[in-house]
Amino acid sequence: MKQENLTQECCSTSPKISKGLMVLQSIASRGCDTQDSEKKPQSTQQSLKKSSQAAAGYFYDKEDQIRKLSKHNGFLSEMEDMRKAFLMRPGCPQFSTRTTSMSHVGSAIMVDLPRTCSGVWKLTEDHPLGRLGSASSVDGRVFPFSKSACELNYPRKRSEPSDPSPTGSPTVVKKSQRTRTPWYISVIHEKDHSLLLMGEELQRFSEMESQMQKKDQEILTLQKEKEALKKQLKNLLRGKGTETSSASIKMDRSFETPLKLGRMSVLKTIYKEEDELQHWMQMQEEYSMAESSKELHVEPGSAIEEKSSEGPPEEAAAAKLSRPSQSKTETLLEVGPEEEEEEEEEEVEGDEAKGTEEGEILVNEEEASWELREDEECHPKRSYSMTESFEEELMAQLEEYERMLMDFQRELEFTRSRYSLATGTITSLQRQTDFQESQLRKVTTENELLEKELRERKQQIQDMTDKFSNLREEKKHQEIMGLIEKENLVLRQQVADLKMDLISSERTIKELNTQTKELEDQVNTDKDHLRRWKDLHDDLQTRNEIIQQTEQQTRVVLEATQARYEKLRNKIIQAVFSVSGNKNLSMELSDSYILESLQRIISERSDFYSQLKQKGVKVPPLQQSDVSLPSKIKKMASK
């Protein structure tokens, strides 16, 4: 139930993922069939390297462990199995979920994945050169390879030695079990290979971007050409009026120049004829004056009237000839700028105006010729010869004007034909611009489609890379978490040991601190004792010196007392021997006897001394030794 709920949630949240899963299942079924048919001949032909064998055995064991662990994982286990089947199919495009036709971009070339993996990452081997464009199924049908984004223009890696499946040889499995390489080496190789593939993919995308930039430049050039053609069309559409106006102006100018020349020639001839007429009239006047003098009534000023009558018709004819030409030029000059500003309808009106102007010119010329004829008829008969020659010249000029009109008509027809040709070229240019616009639209649509495909391919690549990276990262995360937990336990034990060591070291430090304090106290006491001993020593030295001094003094006193004692002894001996009642020398004298005698002497002396004092005789005082001597003698006697 949980698996069904997970699949339903995934399908409802991401329809693209569900479609991709369906495609993966179909491709996996195709890949498994083709792989079983190709496994036996490939396993006998190829051999494993030591590192690949070790990695294959390790990952084979890991696969069994993962299968045991992922039996009850539901949707994740299904995704893992489908990913394995997807990677095991022949001609696997690594980062695509759907098959798209890219025949217009380039031929499909296989992308090789690393072959050192176990059944989880195991792929089919390289196909021979004849099978680069198709993959055959079990039935013998030829499947076209999926020309996805990652298969375009990749160089085929034929130098890599292909490895058979690890189940092919049991000795290889034993060797791989003995020498197992760490799991991260194959992961690093796989990452390097995927990075290389991504680099090639980026190079291909950069080439496609350069192609897109070139196409954008071509589109810009086509747009510029289109704008230039539009400008040419506008100029041509505007130039219709300008060409017709310029052609009419040229025609008018070419028409006006012979008119002006003819007018000038007519005027010159008129002026010459007027001079000749004046000269002839003067001659006639002189002749008439001569005749009038001969004859009776000659009217004065007849010549002047004839001159005036002949002159004005000629001037009128010239004016009449000049007026239509001036009116024509004025109308043409008026029509010209109007035709420049207006478009095709105004051009048609300009052509009609030209026809009306030409008709007016012809009518004016005919009227001028009739007026000249009438004027000539009005002339007197005597100027008939001159007017006849003048009429002939005018007729010749009229014939020239008719010829010029015919030429102008021909030129008009020529300009009409040119106008029709110009309209034809304009229509052809319009068709060309339409064709180029259609090509531009096609190119823009193709570019948009290519950009959409590029975006889709990039999104597909990103989705597949995210899927595979998430799946791989989950496994790696679990393994890393286990390693981290083990390392944490080891670190905790180490921390506990270090704490115990710390406690013991702290205890020893405390003991040592107490010992150092005691030793410091002892040192201080010893220092005090030493100081006291030094003081005592100094005192003793001073006392010793004092004692030595006193000893010397006592020695001196002793020697003096000894000397005095000797003297006293001698005196005592003399006194003893001289005292009455002395005994014989043959008898020995005892100490008591000597003491008694001494006391007697001393007492007598002291009595004598006191008597002398009583009498008032100045006597020196007795010495202390003399006074203290009987007490000492008593002490000695008591001892």
UniProtKB/Swiss-Prot annotation:
Ranges annotated as biased composition (Low complexity): 310-320
Compositional bias (Basic and acidic residues): 292-309, 370-380
The entry's keywords: Coiled coil
Segments forming a coiled coil: 203-242
Compositional bias ranges of the Acidic residues kind: 336-350, 358-369
Chain residue ranges for the region called Disordered: 154-176, 291-385
Protein known as: Coiled-coil domain-containing protein 27
